[in-house]
Amino acid sequence: MNIDWPCFGRTDFLNFFSERHDSVTLFSHADYELRKSDSFLAALYSVLENQQFDFCFSYNFFPLMATVCHKCNIKYISFVYDSPQVKLYSYTVTYPTNYIFLFDSSLVTQFQKEGLSRFYYMPLPVNADRIHSLLQKPYDSARLSADVSFVGSLYNENHNLYDSLQGISSYTKGYLDAIMQAQSHVYGYNFLEECLTPAITAELQNAAHYQKNPDGVESLSFIFSDYYLCRKLT
């Protein structure tokens, strides 16, 4: 079974399952991203109890789905393409029914060092056949060809959380700008979270009013470094 939501790669993965002659049941629910929903739990329980599945699959990890799969003793395979992904700090990642694949090998190592054995490394997949077929069609090669290209979001269009912070002191603003500037000159090591002192973190929390998830163990310093500073730095 595959949880159905408007994710990147949805069509490609469904084509992959079809080529393998796998029988796929799509499950969708408005509360799929929530951390608590009796409605989601009941709906998914009903599907899993009345049909037989080898495993459940989703792009990105969803704690509610992990909870139901654990309860029903069904393998839950998730491939996470969003980074950072705060849902990975839910206690539900510890369930033995999970198979969580990340494209960030250093993050896999980090989780495994903490004793979380349900994390595995896998590069981002691509549907080469579909891309090949697209290249057979006419396109503006001069405009769309390059030695190096970047496809993705710089987070300046949406989700620029850093610029939304209101009420932080000029000292804190200068401090944060300085550590981001320093980080921009360092490749291969992220030290931003280490630079967030308890006092700075408390001031950011007073400005952002971030509500921690009841099933999560993520620290405020992680939230502010990865979701606010790293996105701005990108």
Sequence positions of predicted segments:
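Nucleotide-sugar donor-binding catalytic core of glycosyltransferases
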Residues: 1-9, 117-118, 123-234
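N-terminal pre-catalytic "stem/leader" segment of glycosyltransferase-like enzymes
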Residues: 1-73, 222-228
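A short, active-site helix/loop in glycosyltransferases that binds the activated sugar's phosphate group
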Residues: 100-117
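Short, structured coil segments at secondary-structure junctions
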Residues: 20, 72-73, 95-96, 114-117
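Histidine-centered beta-alpha loop that forms part of the nucleotide-sugar donor binding/catalytic region
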Residues: 60-61, 80-83, 105, 123-126, ...
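A conserved, positively charged/aromatic
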Residues: 89-101
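Active-site proximal beta-strand in glycosyltransferases
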Residues: 69-84, 99-102
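Short, charged, surface-exposed secondary-structure boundary motifs
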Residues: 35-37, 85-92, 110-114, 130-135
